[in-house]
Amino acid sequence: MRILQVIPVLDMAGAETMCQNLSVELHKMGHDVLVISLYTKETPLTENLRKNGVPVVFLEKKTGLDILCFYRLYREIQKFQPDVVHSHIYAGKYAHIAASAAGVKVKIYTVHNIAQKEATSSDQKINRFLFRRMGVVPVALSEEVRQTIVDVYHLDSKEIPIACNGIPMERCEPCSAYSKTATNYIHVGRFCEVKNHANLIHGFVKAHEQYPAIQLRLYGDGPLRQKMENLVAELQAQDFIHFMGLTDDVYSAMAKADVFILPSIYEGMPMTLIEAMATGLPIITTPVGGIVDMLEDGKEAAFTGTDPDSIAGSVSMLVDNAALRQSLGQTARIKAKQFSAETMAKKYLEIYSEGI
């Protein structure tokens, strides 16, 4: 099968990492895969795709509506002659109009977050047209996400297949031991409002007053990073809250941690959460979006609220409770096997094949 993946840009973020994982796995299975990035930007993901035999094409899109981008994409589609065009995030409006013009029958669009937040109101109108008039199939990451697609686009749930995100399990470094006291907490995510960094920082500072040995390492980058660095400075927390920047080896970073924390305001199916599960890290997270379909509170994770007091309480609860941390981590690792890149690729192949 010839499969074209189209994404706005291959930054180090969740949807982009999923696109990379899926493309590499499909290539391993013997399919011809091409990834097109609307914007031109070399990243560790583009490097890893090429390293694994998946070519990447940049369309040099300009900011805003770029009519020439439709033409460039149309030419690439004609050249590659895909059986499937699969889009991610807001690339759908470019990918599927060009794909329809080129006569591609199977058009897939993964909804990477809850539908109310995944697209702007104007893009939702375009998506509604794509789903209803152009035969584009929306794919949900979980049952919870599927219901939001039904609510926003007024589709029958039977028209919306579910394909969970997946990671290459062989790259994970599972925890071999759980320390008596948890001191190293880790968060991996883009610095934006949805990730709730401000409340995480305030909550961790509060927990640190009771447990002065604990440390928080924040991996990632984004528009709010400087603001969060300023907040940490204002709270005089630089000695125990550290900004680590981007990493292309999140598994090694997680292997050095005691607890993973992700107190997001909303989510789809976060890749970093799957990575933490596969590593066997005990997890503190919020029961939002697709997370409730991934983890059970008290069994595979400790659910928390989004406010500083709730976060502080959850952080403090796990510091001295090694038995609970081990139980949460080991159970989550077993559950993580459902979220392998191989399982994800097989599910998408089923979805692709249904349309051919």
Task: List where the protein language model places each region.
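Conserved acidic donor-binding segment of nucleotide-sugar-dependent glycosyltransferases
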Residues: D297-D309, M317-A322
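Short hydrophobic beta-strand element within catalytic cores of glycosyltransferases
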Residues: P282-T285, L295
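Short His-centered aromatic/hydrophobic patch
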Residues: S87-Y94, V111
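A short, well-ordered alpha-helix in the C-terminal region of glycosyltransferases
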Residues: S310, M317, L324-Q338, K347-E350
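Nucleotide-activated donor-binding/catalytic signature segment of Leloir-type glycosyltransferases, i.e.
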Residues: E229-G245
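Acidic anion/phosphate-binding donor-loop and adjacent secondary structure
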Residues: G64-L68, Q147-V152, S157-A182, C192
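Aromatic "clamp/platform" in nucleotide-sugar-dependent glycosyltransferases that forms part
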Residues: L246, I265
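Conserved donor-binding/catalytic core segment of Leloir-type glycosyltransferases
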Residues: L4, Y178-K195, I201-F204
